[in-house]
């Protein structure tokens, strides 16, 4: 691991971008301009091309197939070198792991590599106008019609929603449950139709 840490540190010293001449966000919640988005997308893509994203994700989907300790080293070096943020957080931390664990082969092949490379941006659709962040009170409904679900409802606070290609959406698929958190399902929804 020490040799890898040295490799990452050397790469960061050479490749972490200098001041771009405009304000960079400190978290993905603060991305507010196309200029910031383009800069951060290019940075994430560069990290992925260098082999420093998805360290423990399978190689067949664009990951590195290594132990998660390697990603920890990369993350520490990113902080130590004051690198720009990795902004596709919803894709990297929620959608990707969920798909790797529960997704179909088709979904993994379609989405995982594009999450890592920042080719596609993800947002989340959990909170709703009348219930805020109380996920147990979700009113958005998903009703199965044939082979598909029809989703009806409203979402708010969809961080990165104005830039996203896809949304991970929480909807109620069963209204006849005893507990308010039962009957909820995740859906992958396109943002650009």
Residue ranges and their predicted role:
Residues 87-106, 132:
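N-terminal glycine-rich flavin-associated loop
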Residues 140-143:
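A structural signal for short hydrophobic beta-strand segments in well-ordered beta-sheet cores
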Residues 1-89, 106, 110-117:
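Amphipathic, small/basic residue-rich leader segments at the start of a protein or domain
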Residues 131-134, 149:
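Hydrophobic, small-residue-rich alpha-helical packing segments that form membrane-like cores
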Residues 60, 127-131, 156-157:
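Short, solvent-exposed loop/turn elements at beta->coil junctions and helix N-caps
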Residues 50, 81-84, 116-121, 145-147, ...:
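Short coil/turn connectors at secondary-structure junctions
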Residues 118-126, 170:
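A short, Trp-centered hydrophobic/proline-enriched beta-strand micro-motif
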Residues 148, 152-193:
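A short core secondary-structure module
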């Amino acid at each position: 691991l020490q040799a890898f840490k040295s490799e990452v540190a050397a790469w960061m010293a050479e490749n972490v971008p200098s001041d771009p001449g405009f304000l960079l966000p400190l978290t993905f919640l603060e991305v507010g301009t196309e200029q910031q988005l383009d800069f951060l997308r290019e940075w994430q893509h560069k990290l992925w091309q260098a082999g420093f994203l998805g360290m423990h994700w399978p190689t067949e989907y664009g990951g590195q197939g290594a132990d998660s300790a390697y990603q920890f080293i990369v993350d520490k070096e990113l902080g130590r070198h004051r690198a720009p943020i990795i902004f596709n957080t919803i894709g990297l931390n929620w959608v990707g792991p969920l798909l790797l664990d529960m997704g179909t082969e088709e979904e993994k092949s379609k989405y995982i590599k594009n999450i890592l490379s920042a080719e596609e941006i993800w947002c989340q659709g959990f909170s709703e106008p009348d219930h805020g962040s109380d996920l147990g009170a979700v009113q958005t409904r998903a009703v199965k019609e044939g082979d598909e679900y029809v989703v009806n409802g409203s979402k708010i606070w969809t961080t990165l929603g104005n830039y996203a290609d896809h949304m991970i959406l929480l909807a109620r698929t069963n209204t006849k449950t005893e507990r308010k958190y039962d009957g909820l399902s995740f859906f992958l929804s396109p943002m650009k139709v």
